[in-house]
Amino acid sequence: MKQGIHPEYKEITATCSCGNVIKTRSTVEKNLNLDVCGNCHPFYTGKQRVVDTGGRVERFNKRFNIPSTK
């Protein structure tokens, strides 16, 4: 590998919405905020969870006249 052309590889923190904190390394120097991780993803937990970012589910239901389940 050529010397001096590669970005620095630094430690960052990825924080999930469930509170799980993951330390990893990346060339991106800012910390990440995750919506789902291995601790709260429905595939791994077996529980269904609706992740609504900005009312998109309600907007979809309203557009297609689908009654709300709440």
Swiss-Prot record:
Co-factor binding comment: Binds 1 zinc ion per subunit.
Taxonomic superkingdom: Bacteria
One example of a Gene Ontology biological process annotation: translation
Known cofactor(s): Zn(2+)
UniProt binding sites for Zn(2+): 16, 18, 37, 40
Gene encoding the protein: rpmE
Keyword annotations: Metal-binding, Ribonucleoprotein, Ribosomal protein, RNA-binding, rRNA-binding, Zinc
Organism: Haemophilus ducreyi (strain 35000HP / ATCC 700724)
InterPro entries, alphabetized: Ribosomal_bL28/bL31-like_sf, Ribosomal_bL31, Ribosomal_bL31_A, Ribosomal_bL31_sf
Subunit structure: Part of the 50S ribosomal subunit.
One GO CC annotation: ribosome
Function, as annotated: Binds the 23S rRNA.
GO molecular function, one term: rRNA binding
Name by which UniProt lists this protein: Large ribosomal subunit protein bL31
Family in the record: Belongs to the bacterial ribosomal protein bL31 family. Type A subfamily.
